[in-house]
A protein has these predicted regions:
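Conserved P-loop
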Residues: 1-73, 118-129, 142, 170-173, ...
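Walker B catalytic acidic pair
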Residues: 86-88, 114-115
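Short recognition patches in nucleic-acid-associated and regulatory proteins
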Residues: 142-175
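Conserved ATPase-coupling elements of RecA-like P-loop NTPase cores
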Residues: 88-99, 119-124
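Short basic (Lys/Arg) and small-residue
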Residues: 134
Length: 214
């Protein structure tokens, strides 16, 4: 029986790497599928991992009807055994509904990968809907680490080295062009206390920030 499975974690927990590995495993067994993504750090229409791996993908625009897209390809005779959905936190809730329809109505496995919450600790709408609908929600086992060495559970946004907890999910317009925006992962204790790596003089802040958007 087909399933909708959501793999989630913080930044640096290997979500896109696992998405690419999952696609590779299916392809190596002769299975054919589709890969979707949204706002990948490497640009439009590509899924990339921090390890340097990447693959072409279908960009999920806000108005894309994923279910209709898949049905049309099946109607043209295309074979689709599985679907990979990276950066699923950025999908619209109705697009997540479409993924569930693909699983239940078409019998196609859907593997979604994403981040649960934004820098304000608020669930992304796409992730919230996946938690509500997925057959399984799996937390990634590769643990990202806070600067203190503890397991990182929260994503933090910093502006000029100072952690911010307010503002829109859309980065553009939040700050001026001269401001330095970055993201890093923190344990809950240091996220609540707003103690970043720079503030603690402890070291690394991610040099490859993700574009947290609605």
């Amino acid at each position: 029986m087909a399933e909708l499975i959501y793999y989630c974690g913080t930044m640096d927990s290997g979500k896109s790497t696992l998405a690419l590995q999952t696609a590779h495993n299916h392809k190596s067994r002769g299975r054919t599928g589709l890969i979707f993504t949204n706002k990948d750090r490497a640009g439009t229409g590509v899924i990339s991992s921090r390890l340097g791996l990447q693959s072409e993908a279908i960009e999920v625009e806000p108005d894309l009807d994923i279910h209709k897209f898949v049905v049309e390809h099946l109607s043209m005779g295309d074979r689709i055994d599985y679907i990979i959905c990276d950066e699923a936190q950025f999908y619209q809730p109705d697009q997540i509904d479409g993924l569930a329809k693909i699983v239940d109505g078409l019998g196609i496995d859907v593997y979604a990968f994403g981040i649960l919450a934004d820098f304000r600790t608020k669930l992304f709408p796409g992730s919230a809907r996946l938690v509500e609908l997925a057959d399984r929600v799996n937390t990634l086992q590769v643990e990202a680490l806070c600067w203190c060495g503890s397991r990182a559970t929260h994503n933090a946004r910093t502006v000029n080295g100072v952690m911010v907890t307010e503002g829109e999910q859309v980065v553009v317009g939040d700050v001026g062009k001269s401001d330095e925006i970055a993201y890093e992962v923190l344990c809950r204790r240091h996220h609540m206390r707003q103690v970043t790596a720079r503030a603690s003089r402890a070291g690394h802040i991610s040099s490859d920030p993700l574009p947290f958007t609605e």
